[in-house]
Amino acid sequence: MAELTTLARPYAKAAFEHAQAHQQLANWSAMLGLAAAVSQDDTMQRVLKAPRLTSAEKAATFIDVCGDKFDAKAQNFINVVAENDRLPLLPEIAALFDLYKAEQEKSVDVEVTSAFALNQEQQDKLAKVLSARLNREVRLQVEEDSSLIGGVVIRAGDLVIDGSIRGKIAKLAEALKS
């Protein structure tokens, strides 16, 4: 995984810098999201792995599938990625681009797993507190997992806050073992 990220980083950075310079972050995010989805399609995977096809043929096929969703710069980007046999990296490129975009926009996706359903008021309050703590705009994705017994687990990038009963029991069990 780390190797794929390392290979994808220069492409994501180049796309981000271009999109930022031309104030097209949302457009490029959508185009790269589409490219990532197309590259993961089973039929497209076979095309990308076909040894008989040249890089230019793979790029042309890829662009044909995407139709008019790509502007000239995006088509050029796909051609450059294809020349270097990196089309299978498009999901990683899109993910890194979205990370750069979120950093630029000072926003973060936060995954909240709760033992019980959170009502809108609780979600709004949690988003407000997390926004203040992280100094970013917070977009919550709330899931329910009854195995937590009680409390919540919050994931924002590398930050994990485990306020669940299950987590506390696991810590207590670990402390008793040592």
Curated annotation (Swiss-Prot):
InterPro entries, alphabetized: ATP_synth_OSCP/delta_N_sf (IPR026015), ATPase_OSCP/dsu (IPR000711)
Location of the protein in the cell:
Cell inner membrane
> What keywords does the record list, in alphabetical order?
ATP synthesis, Cell inner membrane, Cell membrane, CF(1), Hydrogen ion transport, Ion transport, Membrane, Transport
Top-rank taxon, per record: Bacteria
Task: Note the topology in the membrane.
Answer: Peripheral membrane protein
Q: Which GO terms describe its cellular component?
A: plasma membrane; proton-transporting ATP synthase complex
Gene Ontology molecular function: any one: proton-transporting ATP synthase activity, rotational mechanism
Classification via Pfam families: OSCP
Principal localization reads membrane
Which SUPFAM superfamilies does this entry report, sorted A to Z?
N-terminal domain of the delta subunit of the F1F0-ATP synthase (SSF47928)
**Coiled-coil stretches noted in the UniProt entry, renumbered to this chain:** none
Entry similarity comment:
Belongs to the ATPase delta chain family.
Q: In UniProt terms, what function does this protein have?
A: F(1)F(0) ATP synthase produces ATP from ADP in the presence of a proton or sodium gradient. F-type ATPases consist of two structural domains, F(1) containing the extramembraneous catalytic core and F(0) containing the membrane proton channel, linked together by a central stalk and a peripheral stalk. During catalysis, ATP synthesis in the catalytic domain of F(1) is coupled via a rotary mechanism of the central stalk subunits to proton translocation. This protein is part of the stalk that links CF(0) to CF(1). It either transmits conformational changes from CF(0) to CF(1) or is implicated in proton conduction.
* Family annotation (NCBIfam families): ATP_synt_delta, PRK05758.2-2
Oligomer status and interactors = F-type ATPases have 2 components, F(1) - the catalytic core - and F(0) - the membrane proton channel. F(1) has five subunits: alpha(3), beta(3), gamma(1), delta(1), epsilon(1). F(0) has three main subunits: a(1), b(2) and c(10-14). The alpha and beta chains form an alternating ring which encloses part of the gamma chain. F(1) is attached to F(0) by a central stalk formed by the gamma and epsilon chains, while a peripheral stalk is formed by the delta and b chains.
What protein name does the entry list?
Answer: ATP synthase subunit delta
